[in-house]
Protein backbone atom coordinates (compact mmCIF):
# COMPACT_ATOMS: atom_id res chain seq x y z
CA UNK A 1 0.00 0.00 0.00
CA UNK A 2 1.23 3.52 -0.74
CA UNK A 3 2.40 5.96 1.90
CA UNK A 4 -1.03 7.63 2.05
CA UNK A 5 -2.10 8.60 5.58
CA UNK A 6 -5.35 6.86 6.60
CA UNK A 7 -7.40 8.55 9.34
CA UNK A 8 -10.86 8.04 10.85
CA UNK A 9 -13.28 10.73 11.93
CA UNK A 10 -16.76 10.63 13.45
CA UNK A 11 -19.36 13.24 14.23
CA UNK A 12 -22.11 15.17 12.43
CA UNK A 13 -22.39 14.34 8.71
CA UNK A 14 -23.64 16.23 5.69
CA UNK A 15 -24.49 13.61 3.06
CA UNK A 16 -27.45 12.31 1.06
CA UNK A 17 -29.11 9.10 2.26
CA UNK A 18 -29.28 5.88 0.23
CA UNK A 19 -32.72 6.74 -1.17
CA UNK A 20 -31.00 8.93 -3.76
CA UNK A 21 -29.72 5.89 -5.68
CA UNK A 22 -33.30 5.20 -6.79
CA UNK A 23 -32.83 8.07 -9.25
CA UNK A 24 -30.43 6.08 -11.45
CA UNK A 25 -31.66 2.57 -10.60
CA UNK A 26 -35.22 3.21 -11.82
CA UNK A 27 -33.81 4.38 -15.16
CA UNK A 28 -31.55 1.35 -15.42
CA UNK A 29 -34.36 -1.20 -14.88
CA UNK A 30 -37.54 0.19 -16.45
CA UNK A 31 -39.60 -2.89 -15.53
CA UNK A 32 -38.92 -2.36 -11.81
CA UNK A 33 -40.65 -0.05 -9.34
CA UNK A 34 -39.14 1.43 -6.19
CA UNK A 35 -41.62 2.09 -3.38
CA UNK A 36 -40.13 4.09 -0.53
CA UNK A 37 -41.82 3.51 2.81
CA UNK A 38 -41.23 6.88 4.39
CA UNK A 39 -42.27 10.45 5.02
CA UNK A 40 -43.19 13.38 2.82
CA UNK A 41 -39.59 14.54 3.17
CA UNK A 42 -38.46 11.28 1.56
CA UNK A 43 -40.94 11.82 -1.27
CA UNK A 44 -39.74 15.39 -1.90
CA UNK A 45 -36.09 14.26 -1.89
CA UNK A 46 -36.58 11.58 -4.54
CA UNK A 47 -38.85 13.67 -6.74
CA UNK A 48 -36.52 16.68 -6.61
CA UNK A 49 -33.36 14.64 -7.22
CA UNK A 50 -34.95 12.84 -10.17
CA UNK A 51 -36.37 16.02 -11.68
CA UNK A 52 -39.57 14.15 -12.56
CA UNK A 53 -43.07 15.44 -11.94
CA UNK A 54 -45.13 12.86 -10.11
CA UNK A 55 -48.04 13.08 -12.59
CA UNK A 56 -45.64 11.69 -15.23
CA UNK A 57 -45.97 8.36 -13.39
CA UNK A 58 -42.27 7.59 -12.86
CA UNK A 59 -41.15 4.15 -11.71
CA UNK A 60 -40.79 5.18 -8.10
CA UNK A 61 -43.10 6.46 -5.39
CA UNK A 62 -43.52 6.84 -1.65
CA UNK A 63 -45.92 5.13 0.70
CA UNK A 64 -46.35 8.03 3.12
CA UNK A 65 -46.22 7.17 6.81
CA UNK A 66 -48.89 9.31 8.48
CA UNK A 67 -49.13 10.31 12.15
CA UNK A 68 -51.45 7.34 12.81
CA UNK A 69 -48.74 4.97 11.58
CA UNK A 70 -46.02 6.65 13.62
CA UNK A 71 -48.20 6.65 16.74
CA UNK A 72 -49.03 2.97 16.34
CA UNK A 73 -52.75 3.62 15.88
CA UNK A 74 -52.79 1.73 12.57
CA UNK A 75 -51.16 -1.53 11.53
CA UNK A 76 -48.49 -0.21 9.18
CA UNK A 77 -47.95 -3.68 7.71
CA UNK A 78 -51.62 -3.99 6.69
CA UNK A 79 -51.61 -0.46 5.30
CA UNK A 80 -48.51 -1.20 3.25
CA UNK A 81 -50.07 -4.39 1.86
CA UNK A 82 -53.06 -2.35 0.74
CA UNK A 83 -50.88 0.31 -0.92
CA UNK A 84 -48.83 -2.32 -2.77
CA UNK A 85 -51.90 -4.11 -4.11
CA UNK A 86 -53.40 -0.82 -5.32
CA UNK A 87 -50.10 0.06 -7.01
CA UNK A 88 -49.83 -3.29 -8.81
CA UNK A 89 -53.45 -3.09 -9.96
CA UNK A 90 -52.77 0.34 -11.44
CA UNK A 91 -49.33 -0.53 -12.88
CA UNK A 92 -49.56 -4.12 -14.18
CA UNK A 93 -46.30 -3.71 -16.17
CA UNK A 94 -44.24 -3.86 -12.95
CA UNK A 95 -42.17 -7.06 -12.82
CA UNK A 96 -40.03 -6.36 -9.75
CA UNK A 97 -41.08 -4.26 -6.78
CA UNK A 98 -38.48 -2.95 -4.34
CA UNK A 99 -39.75 -1.93 -0.91
CA UNK A 100 -37.20 0.63 0.26
CA UNK A 101 -36.77 1.38 3.94
CA UNK A 102 -36.25 4.94 5.18
CA UNK A 103 -35.44 6.63 8.48
CA UNK A 104 -39.12 6.72 9.63
CA UNK A 105 -39.79 3.08 8.69
CA UNK A 106 -36.59 2.00 10.47
CA UNK A 107 -37.50 3.97 13.60
CA UNK A 108 -40.97 2.43 13.97
CA UNK A 109 -39.58 -1.01 13.05
CA UNK A 110 -41.65 -1.88 9.99
CA UNK A 111 -40.46 -5.33 8.94
CA UNK A 112 -40.20 -4.89 5.18
CA UNK A 113 -38.66 -8.34 4.72
CA UNK A 114 -41.78 -9.90 6.25
CA UNK A 115 -44.04 -7.74 4.08
CA UNK A 116 -42.08 -8.76 0.97
CA UNK A 117 -42.22 -12.44 1.93
CA UNK A 118 -46.00 -12.36 2.46
CA UNK A 119 -46.58 -10.47 -0.80
CA UNK A 120 -44.49 -12.97 -2.76
CA UNK A 121 -46.67 -15.77 -1.41
CA UNK A 122 -49.87 -13.91 -2.32
CA UNK A 123 -48.71 -12.80 -5.77
CA UNK A 124 -47.51 -16.31 -6.72
CA UNK A 125 -44.67 -15.16 -8.94
CA UNK A 126 -46.59 -12.56 -10.95
CA UNK A 127 -44.36 -9.87 -9.41
CA UNK A 128 -41.15 -10.34 -7.43
CA UNK A 129 -41.11 -8.25 -4.24
CA UNK A 130 -37.75 -7.42 -2.65
CA UNK A 131 -36.64 -5.07 0.10
CA UNK A 132 -33.57 -3.12 1.13
CA UNK A 133 -32.74 -0.09 3.26
CA UNK A 134 -32.09 3.41 1.95
CA UNK A 135 -32.31 4.90 5.42
CA UNK A 136 -29.94 7.71 6.30
CA UNK A 137 -29.46 5.99 9.66
CA UNK A 138 -27.85 3.02 7.91
CA UNK A 139 -26.70 4.25 4.49
CA UNK A 140 -25.20 7.16 2.62
CA UNK A 141 -25.99 8.14 -0.95
CA UNK A 142 -24.58 5.42 -3.23
CA UNK A 143 -25.00 2.60 -0.71
CA UNK A 144 -28.62 2.36 -1.82
CA UNK A 145 -27.45 0.69 -5.04
CA UNK A 146 -25.37 -1.74 -3.00
CA UNK A 147 -28.48 -2.70 -1.03
CA UNK A 148 -30.64 -3.11 -4.14
CA UNK A 149 -28.10 -5.33 -5.91
CA UNK A 150 -27.56 -7.43 -2.80
CA UNK A 151 -31.32 -8.03 -2.68
CA UNK A 152 -31.28 -9.31 -6.29
CA UNK A 153 -28.37 -11.75 -5.87
CA UNK A 154 -30.41 -14.64 -4.35
CA UNK A 155 -32.53 -14.62 -7.54
CA UNK A 156 -29.54 -15.04 -9.88
CA UNK A 157 -29.48 -18.49 -11.54
CA UNK A 158 -26.43 -20.74 -11.21
CA UNK A 159 -24.10 -21.37 -14.12
CA UNK A 160 -20.73 -23.00 -14.79
CA UNK A 161 -20.20 -20.96 -17.96
CA UNK A 162 -17.03 -18.87 -18.08
CA UNK A 163 -17.97 -15.20 -18.27
CA UNK A 164 -17.09 -11.66 -17.31
CA UNK A 165 -19.65 -9.88 -15.14
CA UNK A 166 -19.53 -6.07 -14.98
CA UNK A 167 -21.07 -5.06 -11.65
CA UNK A 168 -22.43 -1.58 -10.99
CA UNK A 169 -24.72 0.76 -12.91
CA UNK A 170 -23.22 2.33 -16.03
CA UNK A 171 -24.73 4.53 -18.71
CA UNK A 172 -25.97 2.25 -21.49
CA UNK A 173 -23.71 3.81 -24.12
CA UNK A 174 -20.65 3.43 -21.87
CA UNK A 175 -21.56 -0.17 -21.10
CA UNK A 176 -21.89 -0.93 -24.82
CA UNK A 177 -18.44 0.54 -25.57
CA UNK A 178 -16.76 -1.38 -22.75
CA UNK A 179 -18.49 -4.62 -23.76
CA UNK A 180 -17.30 -4.09 -27.33
CA UNK A 181 -13.69 -3.73 -26.11
CA UNK A 182 -13.90 -6.97 -24.13
CA UNK A 183 -15.45 -8.76 -27.11
CA UNK A 184 -12.56 -7.60 -29.33
CA UNK A 185 -10.16 -8.98 -26.74
CA UNK A 186 -11.80 -12.38 -27.13
CA UNK A 187 -14.05 -12.36 -24.06
CA UNK A 188 -17.27 -13.40 -25.75
CA UNK A 189 -19.56 -13.70 -22.74
CA UNK A 190 -19.87 -10.31 -21.03
CA UNK A 191 -22.91 -9.53 -18.88
CA UNK A 192 -23.90 -6.65 -16.62
CA UNK A 193 -25.43 -6.43 -13.16
CA UNK A 194 -27.81 -4.75 -12.67
CA UNK A 195 -29.27 -5.78 -16.02
CA UNK A 196 -31.35 -3.50 -18.22
CA UNK A 197 -34.44 -5.54 -17.29
CA UNK A 198 -34.85 -6.69 -13.69
CA UNK A 199 -36.19 -10.06 -14.86
CA UNK A 200 -33.12 -10.80 -17.02
CA UNK A 201 -30.63 -11.44 -14.24
CA UNK A 202 -27.24 -12.84 -15.27
CA UNK A 203 -26.29 -16.29 -14.04
CA UNK A 204 -23.38 -16.79 -11.66
CA UNK A 205 -21.02 -19.55 -10.58
CA UNK A 206 -17.39 -20.54 -10.02
CA UNK A 207 -16.45 -19.57 -13.60
CA UNK A 208 -17.85 -16.04 -13.20
CA UNK A 209 -15.21 -13.32 -13.01
CA UNK A 210 -16.55 -10.12 -11.48
CA UNK A 211 -15.19 -6.71 -12.50
CA UNK A 212 -16.57 -3.91 -10.34
CA UNK A 213 -17.38 -0.67 -12.13
CA UNK A 214 -18.21 1.25 -8.94
CA UNK A 215 -16.28 1.39 -5.64
CA UNK A 216 -19.27 1.45 -3.30
CA UNK A 217 -20.52 -2.12 -3.82
CA UNK A 218 -19.01 -3.73 -0.71
CA UNK A 219 -21.97 -5.94 0.26
CA UNK A 220 -22.66 -6.88 -3.37
CA UNK A 221 -19.06 -7.99 -3.91
CA UNK A 222 -19.14 -10.04 -0.71
CA UNK A 223 -22.38 -11.81 -1.69
CA UNK A 224 -21.14 -12.55 -5.22
CA UNK A 225 -17.96 -14.00 -3.76
CA UNK A 226 -20.05 -16.16 -1.42
CA UNK A 227 -21.84 -17.45 -4.53
CA UNK A 228 -18.49 -18.67 -5.87
CA UNK A 229 -17.62 -15.81 -8.22
CA UNK A 230 -14.07 -14.46 -8.45
CA UNK A 231 -13.60 -10.74 -7.77
CA UNK A 232 -10.94 -9.27 -10.08
CA UNK A 233 -8.72 -6.81 -8.20
CA UNK A 234 -8.23 -3.61 -10.17
CA UNK A 235 -8.46 0.17 -9.98
CA UNK A 236 -11.79 1.57 -11.10
CA UNK A 237 -12.39 2.69 -14.71
CA UNK A 238 -12.07 6.44 -14.18
CA UNK A 239 -9.56 8.24 -16.38
CA UNK A 240 -7.12 6.81 -18.89
CA UNK A 241 -4.86 5.03 -16.39
CA UNK A 242 -7.62 3.59 -14.22
CA UNK A 243 -9.62 2.36 -17.21
CA UNK A 244 -6.56 0.84 -18.88
CA UNK A 245 -5.51 -1.04 -15.73
CA UNK A 246 -9.12 -2.13 -15.20
CA UNK A 247 -9.36 -3.62 -18.69
CA UNK A 248 -5.87 -5.14 -18.39
CA UNK A 249 -6.85 -6.85 -15.12
CA UNK A 250 -9.80 -8.52 -16.85
CA UNK A 251 -7.59 -9.55 -19.77
CA UNK A 252 -5.02 -11.06 -17.39
CA UNK A 253 -7.78 -12.98 -15.63
CA UNK A 254 -8.77 -14.55 -18.96
CA UNK A 255 -5.16 -15.22 -20.02
CA UNK A 256 -5.17 -12.70 -22.88
CA UNK A 257 -1.81 -11.54 -24.24
CA UNK A 258 -0.81 -8.00 -23.29
CA UNK A 259 0.23 -7.30 -26.88
CA UNK A 260 -3.39 -7.76 -28.01
CA UNK A 261 -4.63 -5.50 -25.22
CA UNK A 262 -2.12 -2.81 -26.20
CA UNK A 263 -3.05 -3.00 -29.89
CA UNK A 264 -6.71 -2.38 -29.08
CA UNK A 265 -6.28 0.20 -26.32
CA UNK A 266 -3.36 2.30 -27.59
CA UNK A 267 -5.40 4.22 -30.21
CA UNK A 268 -8.04 4.98 -27.56
CA UNK A 269 -5.38 6.06 -25.07
CA UNK A 270 -3.73 8.37 -27.61
CA UNK A 271 -7.03 10.11 -28.45
CA UNK A 272 -8.02 10.40 -24.80
CA UNK A 273 -4.71 11.97 -23.76
CA UNK A 274 -4.98 14.49 -26.57
CA UNK A 275 -8.52 15.41 -25.49
CA UNK A 276 -7.33 15.86 -21.89
CA UNK A 277 -4.75 18.55 -22.72
CA UNK A 278 -6.97 21.69 -22.43
CA UNK A 279 -8.40 20.46 -19.13
CA UNK A 280 -4.98 19.57 -17.72
CA UNK A 281 -3.81 23.09 -18.55
CA UNK A 282 -6.61 24.45 -16.37
CA UNK A 283 -6.36 21.91 -13.54
CA UNK A 284 -2.61 21.43 -13.18
CA UNK A 285 -1.24 22.87 -9.94
CA UNK A 286 -4.69 23.64 -8.53
CA UNK A 287 -5.49 22.51 -4.96
CA UNK A 288 -8.35 20.05 -4.46
CA UNK A 289 -10.27 19.08 -1.31
CA UNK A 290 -12.75 16.18 -1.53
CA UNK A 291 -15.48 15.99 1.12
CA UNK A 292 -17.06 12.57 1.72
CA UNK A 293 -20.30 11.56 0.03
CA UNK A 294 -20.24 9.10 -2.90
CA UNK A 295 -17.27 6.76 -2.17
CA UNK A 296 -15.95 7.79 -5.59
CA UNK A 297 -13.57 10.22 -3.89
CA UNK A 298 -10.42 8.05 -3.90
CA UNK A 299 -10.57 7.06 -7.61
CA UNK A 300 -11.38 10.67 -8.51
CA UNK A 301 -8.42 11.95 -6.49
CA UNK A 302 -6.13 9.42 -8.17
CA UNK A 303 -7.26 10.58 -11.62
CA UNK A 304 -7.11 14.29 -10.87
CA UNK A 305 -3.69 14.02 -9.25
CA UNK A 306 -1.92 11.62 -11.59
CA UNK A 307 -3.47 12.60 -14.93
CA UNK A 308 -4.49 16.22 -14.39
CA UNK A 309 -1.73 17.45 -12.08
CA UNK A 310 -3.95 18.64 -9.23
CA UNK A 311 -2.60 18.91 -5.69
CA UNK A 312 -4.69 16.81 -3.30
CA UNK A 313 -5.19 18.41 0.12
CA UNK A 314 -7.51 15.79 1.64
CA UNK A 315 -9.65 12.89 0.43
CA UNK A 316 -12.77 12.38 2.50
CA UNK A 317 -14.81 9.20 2.03
CA UNK A 318 -17.89 7.99 3.93
CA UNK A 319 -16.51 4.44 4.20
CA UNK A 320 -13.24 2.85 3.19
CA UNK A 321 -13.11 -0.79 2.08
CA UNK A 322 -9.37 -1.37 2.11
CA UNK A 323 -9.63 -4.57 0.05
CA UNK A 324 -11.63 -3.00 -2.81
CA UNK A 325 -9.58 0.21 -2.66
CA UNK A 326 -6.09 -1.26 -2.35
CA UNK A 327 -5.26 -0.89 -6.06
CA UNK A 328 -6.48 2.72 -5.98
CA UNK A 329 -4.61 3.69 -2.82
CA UNK A 330 -1.41 2.19 -4.22
CA UNK A 331 -1.63 4.68 -7.12
CA UNK A 332 -2.08 7.78 -4.95
CA UNK A 333 0.77 10.21 -4.26
CA UNK A 334 2.59 9.17 -1.06
CA UNK A 335 1.66 12.31 0.89
CA UNK A 336 -2.13 11.99 0.46
CA UNK A 337 -4.38 12.22 3.52
CA UNK A 338 -7.47 9.99 3.43
CA UNK A 339 -10.15 10.57 6.08
CA UNK A 340 -12.85 7.93 6.55
CA UNK A 341 -16.08 9.22 8.07
CA UNK A 342 -16.89 12.84 8.78
CA UNK A 343 -17.10 15.52 11.41
CA UNK A 344 -18.44 18.17 9.09
CA UNK A 345 -17.54 21.20 11.24
CA UNK A 346 -13.92 20.13 11.67
CA UNK A 347 -13.67 19.25 8.00
CA UNK A 348 -15.01 22.65 6.95
CA UNK A 349 -12.44 24.29 9.24
CA UNK A 350 -9.72 22.36 7.40
CA UNK A 351 -11.20 23.45 4.06
CA UNK A 352 -11.01 27.12 5.06
CA UNK A 353 -7.50 26.77 6.50
CA UNK A 354 -6.15 25.13 3.32
CA UNK A 355 -7.62 27.62 0.79
CA UNK A 356 -8.40 25.06 -1.95
CA UNK A 357 -9.06 26.07 -5.53
CA UNK A 358 -11.87 23.50 -5.76
CA UNK A 359 -13.95 21.49 -3.27
CA UNK A 360 -15.91 18.38 -4.27
CA UNK A 361 -18.89 18.16 -1.91
CA UNK A 362 -22.58 17.49 -1.51
CA UNK A 363 -25.23 19.94 -2.66
CA UNK A 364 -26.00 21.00 0.90
CA UNK A 365 -22.49 22.37 1.41
CA UNK A 366 -21.89 23.80 -2.06
CA UNK A 367 -23.83 27.07 -1.79
CA UNK A 368 -22.41 28.07 1.63
CA UNK A 369 -18.87 27.42 0.36
CA UNK A 370 -19.54 29.32 -2.88
CA UNK A 371 -20.77 32.24 -0.75
CA UNK A 372 -17.35 32.22 0.92
CA UNK A 373 -15.67 32.45 -2.49
CA UNK A 374 -14.68 28.78 -2.71
CA UNK A 375 -15.40 27.01 -6.03
CA UNK A 376 -17.28 23.72 -5.68
CA UNK A 377 -18.34 20.69 -7.69
CA UNK A 378 -21.35 18.60 -6.65
CA UNK A 379 -20.52 14.96 -5.86
CA UNK A 380 -23.86 13.86 -7.25
CA UNK A 381 -22.82 14.89 -10.77
CA UNK A 382 -20.20 12.11 -10.85
CA UNK A 383 -22.92 9.52 -10.36
CA UNK A 384 -25.32 10.93 -12.96
CA UNK A 385 -22.69 11.60 -15.63
CA UNK A 386 -21.21 9.01 -18.07
CA UNK A 387 -17.62 9.20 -16.80
CA UNK A 388 -16.33 5.61 -16.99
CA UNK A 389 -13.84 4.35 -19.54
CA UNK A 390 -10.90 5.67 -21.55
CA UNK A 391 -13.16 7.54 -24.00
CA UNK A 392 -14.81 9.48 -21.18
CA UNK A 393 -11.62 10.76 -19.51
CA UNK A 394 -11.87 14.26 -21.01
CA UNK A 395 -15.56 14.49 -20.06
CA UNK A 396 -14.62 13.57 -16.50
CA UNK A 397 -11.86 16.19 -16.41
CA UNK A 398 -14.24 18.81 -17.80
CA UNK A 399 -16.54 18.35 -14.81
CA UNK A 400 -13.72 19.81 -12.69
CA UNK A 401 -12.25 22.36 -15.09
CA UNK A 402 -15.66 23.94 -15.75
CA UNK A 403 -16.20 25.41 -12.24
CA UNK A 404 -12.68 26.85 -12.31
CA UNK A 405 -13.38 28.54 -15.66
CA UNK A 406 -16.66 29.85 -14.27
CA UNK A 407 -14.84 31.22 -11.23
CA UNK A 408 -12.34 33.03 -13.47
CA UNK A 409 -15.18 34.66 -15.39
CA UNK A 410 -17.16 35.67 -12.31
CA UNK A 411 -14.39 36.58 -9.84
CA UNK A 412 -14.56 40.12 -8.38
CA UNK A 413 -11.55 41.42 -10.35
CA UNK A 414 -13.19 40.49 -13.63
CA UNK A 415 -16.48 42.06 -12.59
CA UNK A 416 -14.75 45.25 -11.42
CA UNK A 417 -12.71 45.65 -14.60
CA UNK A 418 -15.83 45.24 -16.69
Curated annotation (Swiss-Prot):
Pathway: Porphyrin-containing compound metabolism; chlorophyll biosynthesis (light-independent). GO terms for molecular function: 4 iron, 4 sulfur cluster binding; ATP binding; metal ion binding; oxidoreductase activity, acting on iron-sulfur proteins as donors; oxidoreductase activity, acting on the CH-CH group of donors, iron-sulfur protein as acceptor. Component of the dark-operative protochlorophyllide reductase (DPOR) that uses Mg-ATP and reduced ferredoxin to reduce ring D of protochlorophyllide (Pchlide) to form chlorophyllide a (Chlide). This reaction is light-independent. The NB-protein (ChlN-ChlB) is the catalytic component of the complex. Pfam families: Oxidored_nitro. It catalyses: chlorophyllide a + oxidized 2[4Fe-4S]-[ferredoxin] + 2 ADP + 2 phosphate = protochlorophyllide a + reduced 2[4Fe-4S]-[ferredoxin] + 2 ATP + 2 H2O. The keyword Acyltransferase does not apply. Its cofactor is [4Fe-4S] cluster. Belongs to the BchN/ChlN family. Binds 1 [4Fe-4S] cluster per heterodimer. The cluster is bound at the heterodimer interface by residues from both subunits. The gene is chlN. [4Fe-4S] cluster binds at residues 17, 42, 103. Protochlorophyllide reductase is composed of three subunits; ChlL, ChlN and ChlB. Forms a heterotetramer of two ChlB and two ChlN subunits. This is Light-independent protochlorophyllide reductase subunit N. It is an enzyme of class 1 (oxidoreductase). Its EC number is 1.3.7.7. The keyword Membrane does not apply. Gene3D superfamilies: Nitrogenase molybdenum iron protein domain. The lineage of its organism: Bacteria, Bacillati, Cyanobacteriota, Cyanophyceae, Synechococcales. Keywords: 4Fe-4S, ATP-binding, Chlorophyll biosynthesis, Iron, Iron-sulfur, Metal-binding, Nucleotide-binding, Oxidoreductase, Photosynthesis. Coiled coil: none annotated. InterPro entries: LIPOR_BchN/ChlN, Nase/OxRdtase_comp1, Protochl_reductN. One of its GO terms (biological process) is light-independent chlorophyll biosynthetic process.
Amino acid sequence: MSGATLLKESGPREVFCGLTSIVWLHRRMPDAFFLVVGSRTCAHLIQSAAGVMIFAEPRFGTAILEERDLAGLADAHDELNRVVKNLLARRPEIKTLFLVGSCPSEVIKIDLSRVAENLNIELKGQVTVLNYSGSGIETTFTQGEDGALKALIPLMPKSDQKKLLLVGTLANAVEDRLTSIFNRLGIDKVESFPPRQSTELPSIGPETKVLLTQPYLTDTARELKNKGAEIIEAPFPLGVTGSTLWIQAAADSFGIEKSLVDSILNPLISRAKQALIPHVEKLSGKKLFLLPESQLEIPLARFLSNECGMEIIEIGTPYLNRDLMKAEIDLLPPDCRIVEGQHVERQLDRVRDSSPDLVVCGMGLANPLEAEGISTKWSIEMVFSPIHGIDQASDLAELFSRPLRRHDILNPKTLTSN
